[in-house]
Curated annotation (Swiss-Prot):
The gene is bioB. PANTHER family: BIOTIN SYNTHASE, BIOTIN SYNTHASE, MITOCHONDRIAL. This is Biotin synthase. It comes from the Bacteria. HAMAP family: BioB (MF_01694). Keywords: 2Fe-2S, 4Fe-4S, Biotin biosynthesis, Iron, Iron-sulfur, Metal-binding, S-adenosyl-L-methionine, Transferase. Residues 38-256 form the Radical SAM core domain. Binds 1 [4Fe-4S] cluster. The cluster is coordinated with 3 cysteines and an exchangeable S-adenosyl-L-methionine. Catalyzes the conversion of dethiobiotin (DTB) to biotin by the insertion of a sulfur atom into dethiobiotin via a radical-based mechanism.
Amino acid sequence: MAHRPRWTLSQVTELFEKPLLDLLFEAQQVHRQHFDPRQVQVSTLLSIKTGACPEDCKYCPQSSRYKTGLEAERLMEVEQVLESARKAKAAGSTRFCMGAAWKNPHERDMSYLEQMVQGVKAMGLEACMTLGTLSESQAQRLANAGLDYYNHNLDTSPEFYGNIITTRTYQERLDTLEKVRDAGIKVCSGGIVGLGETVKDRAGLLLQLANLPTPPESVPINMLVKVKGTPLADNDDVDAFDFIRTIAVARIMMPTSYVRLSAGREQMNEQTQAMCFMAGANSIFYGCKLLTTPNPEEDKDLQLFRKLGLNPQQTAVLAGDNEQQQRLEQALMTPDTDEYYNAAAL
């Protein structure tokens, strides 16, 4: 494997300080070297277990510590999840992400999670989960079930992290990413813009991600969605150009990673989203629901794609791509359901 130089904080800071149009030009050049600039990967996220999370993440309406009006729900039945995955595939998604509001999954739930992964894979979709902290054995079980991606965000820089979360250390997050990688699962990890962090903190976040032994295959960049009842509900709005800069720097630093427009896209007008795609974003969560916050409606996404000449990327799951794939092919029931979130994001 060719040696990959490590980034320094001063190098990343210099990128953030570049004139915006110069930065966008560089990011677009990098993007075109590694991706078809007209292709956008489309994912759908389903909250398979909502609310009552014991963590204290100050941005999150799912924390049991804040009164946000969110009604807690138990882990969904496997067939309910698979019904949602079918609809997601029919709507054009190629990756189905399942998120649970936990500090970590309980052993009693692992068999259900494995069945969910196996069922999603059998449909020809990529499977992704975000379940909190994992043990080595849990990561391996999910890998054996066929899980393609595991999402576990770093959220912000190590220096600012303690201002946002105290119930889980930064090192615990890094340890989970290492366990996921060691199990053979692709890593999805990014952060949030708008927590009250400085530009240096944004640089520090991207530095951590890019300097991992292997950078994440997927890097979600979220804009804070301010939810009444959370400690960050009154934070200042994020300047659109600052967000676009973050996308561009992420693209330059991690040229082969998918950079995803995630939470907060509902707050962006078409022009801002277009500039994010120009800056190198090439993945979105699609549809009407972003876990517990709104996301642009599907038809609006498709209209924007048409205006910009973008196309949803075809599924990356190929025959034989996963050792479990042939074993996972099985007849699946296809009842209709309305209990489904056709979009997403962490």
